[in-house]
From Swiss-Prot:
GO biological process: succinate metabolic process
Originating organism: Legionella pneumophila (strain Lens)
Taxon lineage: Bacteria, Pseudomonadati, Pseudomonadota, Gammaproteobacteria, Legionellales
Function, in words: An FAD assembly protein, which accelerates covalent attachment of the cofactor into other proteins. Plays an essential role in the assembly of succinate dehydrogenase (SDH, respiratory complex II), an enzyme complex that is a component of both the tricarboxylic acid cycle and the electron transport chain, and which couples the oxidation of succinate to fumarate with the reduction of ubiquinone (coenzyme Q) to ubiquinol. Required for flavinylation (covalent attachment of FAD) of the flavoprotein subunit SdhA of SDH and other flavinylated proteins as well.
Protein family per UniProt: Belongs to the SdhE FAD assembly factor family.
Protein name as catalogued: FAD assembly factor SdhE
Gene Ontology annotations for the cellular component aspect, listed alphabetically: cytoplasm
Any one Pfam family match given in the protein's UniProt record, by short name: Sdh5
Amino acid sequence: MDNREKSRLLWKCRRGMLELDLVLQKFIANEIDRLTENQLKAFDNLLTHNDPNLYAWLMGHEEPEKELLEIVSFIRNCD
């Protein structure tokens, strides 16, 4: 992944909720270089969803769509 793409994903991690900012920015800072191409695509797709859904999925209050389940589980388990 080139620096431009990394910068784009880092920018997309900046959300309107502090809680999401903390989780997403920590995740991407620690894991970006280890994610597979499919995981990067799933993460990029995840970031297209609205903050209330992201928060509910990442906090385990609701289950995400099937195609996002793997990346959401991965983010939940990264600490």
